[in-house]
């Protein structure tokens, strides 16, 4: 897949900052995006669930303000990593929050469920699936 133009035009290099469990949060994501790379965080890092919306609003607000103050800067989009496993009872509620705020990129881990892909695509969001092998990549593409 080629990098979509609206992303390519706003990144300094094709890099996604890893969504690190318990580490990645708004401060790191904002810094990454300001540096021109895609910042990301796991939705489950925002605890309790309502904090996810607060994080997304903060990230979007601070990046918009930075872009306004620095119109020539490449400010990359951000991503929310969704753990798509039966043990994640927040998945659909977290996706509702991501859809409400039109998170630019959703990163799925463990499996790419159709309902997550459809939800992200409903507003033009992109879905990247995190895989560890060629076999998993082929399975995700099915």
Language-model-detected regions and their locations in the chain:
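Active-site entrance/lid segments in N-terminal catalytic domains of soluble metabolic enzymes
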Residues: 1-142
């Amino acid at each position: 897949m080629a990098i979509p133009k609206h992303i390519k035009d706003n990144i300094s290099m094709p890099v996604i900052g890893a969504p690190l469990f318990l580490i990645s949060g708004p401060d790191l994501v904002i810094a990454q995006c300001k540096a021109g790379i895609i910042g990301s965080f796991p939705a489950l890092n925002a605890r309790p669930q309502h904090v996810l919306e607060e994080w997304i609003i903060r990230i979007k607000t601070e990046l918009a303000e930075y872009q306004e103050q620095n119109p020539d800067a490449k400010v990359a989009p951000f991503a929310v990593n969704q753990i798509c496993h039966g043990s994640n009872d927040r998945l659909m509620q977290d996706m509702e929050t991501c859809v409400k705020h039109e998170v630019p990129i959703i990163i799925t881990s463990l499996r790419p469920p159709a309902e997550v892909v459809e939800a992200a695509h409903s507003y033009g969001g992109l879905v990247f699936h995190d895989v560890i092998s060629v076999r998993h990549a082929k399975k995700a593409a099915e």
